[in-house]
Amino acid sequence: FGKWLENLQDWNLSRSRFWGTPLPIWRTENGAEEMCIDSVATLYAEIEKAVAAGIMASNPFADKGFVPGDYSAENYEKIDLHRPYVDDIVLVSPTGKPMYRETDLIDVWFDSGSMPYAQIHYPFENKDAFDNGELFPADFIAEGVDQTRGWFFTLHAIGTMVFGSPAFKAVVSNGLVLDKNGEKMSKRKGNAVDPFETIEKFGSDPLRWYMIWSSSPWDNLKYDHDGVAEVSRKFFSTLSNTYNFFAMYANVDGFTGDEPQIPLAERPEIDRWILSLLNTLVKTVTEEFDDYEPTRATRAV
C-alpha cells in the first residue's frame, strides 16, 4: 500500500457512462462559464433562476412537491438525481447563457471513497458527531488485499483532499476462503460451499467462530465442514452444557444473584483461582482485540 501511494498516478474522476452518479457540473456551450453544484438545495435555487430567466419552463423539483431542507426519505423519493432526469435540467450562467450538465459520471470508486460522509449525509446532517472525531476517521477498515488500489486508496485520497486526514487508523486485510485442500472455490470445480446451507446446518455463531478461530483474518482459510462441526461440539456444546448445569442447580437452590457478596479474601482458594483465571482471560482477550488479533483472542477463550 505504501509503494502504491509513493508511485501514485493522477486519478481520472470522470467516466463516459450512463449508470452512476452524475457529475454536478454545468457549463455553457462555449465552456467559458461553469458551475459546480454543492447541494440539492443549491440546485433547486439555480433552477428557480433558470425559470425566472425563461430558460426552463418550470422547476421539476417544485412540480413534484419537493421541499429543500427536508431530508426525509418520503421527500427525496419525489425526485431522481440520476440520468436521464438530471440532464433535462438547464441552468443559467451569470451572463444569462444556458448551462448544460457535463455528460460524464463520476468514477464509482469516488462513491466508495465518499462512504464516511455520504452514509451519514455530512455536512447537512450529523455534522457535530463527525467534526468532533466520533465518526471520522474510522478505527479500522476490513477488506481484501486487492482493495489497496481501490477502497483503501479512495477513502484516503478523499479524506486527505477534503479534511487533511487519513480515513482510517488501521487495516485488517482479509485473506481468501479456500476449500479444505487449499484450492480456490468455484462452481466449475464443484468445491464451492453454500454459506446458507452451512448456517442452516450448524448455525451462524459456530461458523463465525470457526472462521475467526481457525486462522488469522489476513491468512487464507482452508474451509472444512468437519472443522465447523468440531467447533460446534467442543466449544458451543460445552458452553451450553455449562450454562444448563448452572441454571438447573441455581433454580433448585433458589439462586437469584441478589445474595450478599462474599469478600474475595474469605472465599475458598479454588474460587479465587477461578476468578483470577477469568480476569486474566478478560485482560488477554481485550489486549488481543485492541491489537487487532481476533484469532489469538478466540483461542485464548
Regions found by a protein language model. Name each.
Residues 261, 265, 269-272, 276-280:
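N-terminal accessory segments
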Residues 1-252, 274-301:
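Structured secondary-structure scaffolds
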Residues 248-262:
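Intrinsic disorder at enzyme termini
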